[in-house]
Swiss-Prot record:
It comes from the Bacteria. This is Protein ApaG. Residues 3-127 form the ApaG domain. HAMAP family: ApaG. Disulfide bonds: none annotated. Pfam families: DUF525. PROSITE patterns: APAG. It comes from Agrobacterium fabrum (strain C58 / ATCC 33970).
Length: 130
């Protein structure tokens, strides 16, 4: 499990390999990841946008930026947490992901919350990127 803390907002990521959706013979490797965002601060925040930086084993980079996560822009009051799962396909057996969430407070202040870097490793594969 991977963790990052920004302004008392904790992001935890737990990646896992999806063998049933992967096909190594066709250079298709798929991972899922569960994210928990916990607002341990004393101010409500809204997740407005997400940014992902995804690097495969060959150094190929894909950047993803867009509104919310899994079609939602959750609002987290102090003490609230939000959990979602998503996935990432790659053409190589390993990779690395990191990024940030763009959060907004009730008074309109926008700030970035770090998503920790985490590795995507196929089972039985020596770790290449980390």
């Amino acid at each position: 499990m991977y963790r990052a803390l920004t302004r008392d907002i904790e992001v935890t990521v737990d990646p896992y390999y999806l063998e049933e959706q992967s096909d190594p013979d066709d250079d298709r490797y798929v991972w899922g990841y569960k994210v928990v965002i916990a607002n341990n601060s004393d101010v409500p925040v809204k997740l407005v946008n997400r940014y992902w930086h995804i690097t495969d084993q060959n150094g190929q980079v894909d950047e993803v930026y867009g509104p919310g996560v899994v079609g939602e822009q959750p609002q987290l009051k102090p003490g609230d947490s939000y959990e979602y799962s998503s996935g990432c396909p790659l053409d190589t057996p390993s990779g690395l992901m990191f990024g940030h969430y763009e959060m907004e407070t009730e008074n309109g202040e926008v700030f970035n919350v770090t998503i920790p870097a985490f590795s995507l490793d196929s089972p039985g594969l020596m770790r290449v990127l980390n």
